[in-house]
Amino acid sequence: LISDRSEGFDMGCGSGRWARWMAEKVCTLNCIDPSDAIEISKNNLKNFKNINYFRASVDDDILLTASQDFGYSLGVLHHIPDTQAALSSCVKLLKPGAPFLVYLYYSFDNRSKLYSLIWKASDLIRKLIFNLPPFLKYWITDCIAIFIYYPLTRIVLAAERCGIDISNIPLSYYKDHSLYTMRTDARDRFGTPLEQRFSKVKIHNMMLEAGLDEIKFSSNAPFWCAVGYKK
């Protein structure tokens, strides 16, 4: 479905974290982001000649309807007030039969109540942090990554090597990830004004409503990642 002749889009590309991987595999990648991060993406991906950059939001109609061979939006649409409308805007850009990959924050529908309570406590912290001036917000989220995410993941990794089940420990997903990823995700998690969460069933229904079918969910963290194909 995706080849070196394909053209697609990265909706909410940020600093180009996923675009770096995808651009190597396709003919043209359209990176779209409404924030200053699009400039960071340009710098990070300057060696790629097959990327177009657009400072725009999901509903700005930057690309032609039904023009794209694939699309993805990873960890972005749950920060938009009307996530359903944003998802539908992405899908309308796809050609019939084209795949769309999405990652939306889960509502802990596959976790314990204690896990959910820990998140609620962290969400109170997020509501304090996102109102801070940008430089202070970035400094705090970097500190969270360096002094909370990273040490905890080292402990989790050691526990796993000792044969302990770590699947229900918060942040265990990051045990094999770089500090750069932790910094990026901490900023995404704590530095945004709106964070919505959805159950697997809800996401499935949203994707159907947006015009996708043959929907499949990943059984691995992070949750929920799903792919569907435009009808």
Please describe what each predicted stretch is.
Residues 122-199:
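C-terminal alpha-helical "lid/dimerization" subdomain adjacent to the S-adenosyl-L-methionine
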Residues 99-131, 141:
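Conserved class I S-adenosyl-L-methionine
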Residues 60-71:
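A short acidic, Gly/Pro-enriched loop at the edge of an enzyme's catalytic core
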